[in-house]
Amino acid sequence: MRVATRLRKNAAVMSVRRREWLVRLSLIVVSLLLFLVVGEIAARILISRQNGGKEGKEQARYTEYDPLLGWRKRKMASATYKRREYTVEVKTNSQGLRDPERSLEPPPQTFRILALGDSFVEGYTVDLKDTVTKRLESRLNDSGCAAEVINGGTAGYSTDQEYLFYRSDGARYRPSLVLLFFFWNDVIYLDRQDYFGTPKPAFEMGDAQVKLHRYPVKEKPKEASSSEDEKPEPVEGSALLAMIRERLWLGAPDVHDALARLGLWNPIPKSSPRLEMLVYDQRDLAPVEDAWEKAEAILKSLKQDVEDHGSTLALVYIPGKMEVQEASWKATRQLYRLKDGAWNLDKVRQKVERLTSTLHIPLIDLNPALKAAEQPFRSTYLMFDGHWNARGHDEAASAVFDWLKTSKSLPEVCGGTLPLQARSAQVFDPALQTREP
């Protein structure tokens, strides 16, 4: 009797516990399903609000054809970049710079720097106040050194166009110091006559010298513009899964492919690198080496021209995202199925080091500073865009500011050895092949 009673009690307890576990399991399942449903809805809302578009679409709204440079920013123009990671309005001043209004003549007792570069310097991924030039200017002024850092950057430019911009426009501002920001994709376009279909200037080599080969640059036929913002294509399947996959692809490619092997999604598809990326190839490829030869000649000419004006030239090396982030390098290797040793991540930087050493151009390498600044969930680069975010611009400005102090590349009133401004403001007239005041 006692045994039977005990068995009935144990059975009742087990039944209660079983029901409790079933209730708990049901709550877990319902919570998980609710989480997935809410996550899916949120993912679809986020994707629907993402802005698509191409760089050229916005750029066409504030640039114009230029017979020397191929294109330049229009005066007093504006356009808004709408991207998944940023929405930024770009405005130009009365001189066609993405900058505050600047007089051609430097203000009294003011140190003037001119920054030459491409989209990293123009900085269309961040507000004007957050660009590398404005952050550097703020640091100088906050330190007690009255300064102006002029933003001479234009998206899509390579070193040849930056050189020509200095000769035709930049020298007018009498900068004491000229900072040339150099990025890996500048190299190959030095030996090309168009940039993604848009004609650009071309130089020809002769006796290690460069000569402008084509003036005026051909004008690209105008395309019909659309005022509507381009939207991303609708997601097929789960939007939440697509968002997770996309972020793992770029941020944790090993995890992405591990889950792909389990059948959750397809592995990273194989692609072929564009010619411009072969500057990292371990082999010395002829088209790349020809472009490097032209880069050396253009840098030599720019240095001579800057010094003829009584200014100093320094080169600022911008590392590619994959040079700074291990995850980006892994994703690149998987995308192109690169074998070990096929590419050398240090090759571009090493080439730049040799060039600047040979030409006696001071080098500011941003690689160490940007690597040191990288933190989990606090990157210096945008995840999808590949340019700097506001933090990246600020870290770059900080590194340049530190170099200015340690190298004494400041005017005497700020503890350095440079003049406040250039001796000459003469510019180049390509139509006459002469200089004019």
Where are these regions (language model features)?
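Serine-dependent acyl-ester chemistry module
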Residues: 17-19, 184-354, 358-361, 366-374, ...
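N-terminal Lys/Arg-rich, disordered targeting/topogenic segments
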Residues: 1-20
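Hydrophobic membrane-insertion alpha-helices, especially the h-region
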Residues: 26-41
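Conserved SGNH/GDSL esterase-like catalytic core that processes O-acyl groups on lipids
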Residues: 84-91, 95-98, 103, 107-108, ...
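Short, amphipathic alpha-helical "lid/cap" segments that border enzyme active or binding sites
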Residues: 159, 163, 292, 296, ...
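Generic structural signal for small/hydrophobic residues in well-ordered secondary structure
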Residues: 40, 118, 162, 178, ...
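Histidine-centered active-site loop/cap adjacent to the catalytic His
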Residues: 27, 382-424
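Membrane/wall-proximal cationic-aromatic binding patches
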Residues: 50-139, 143, 266-272, 348-352, ...
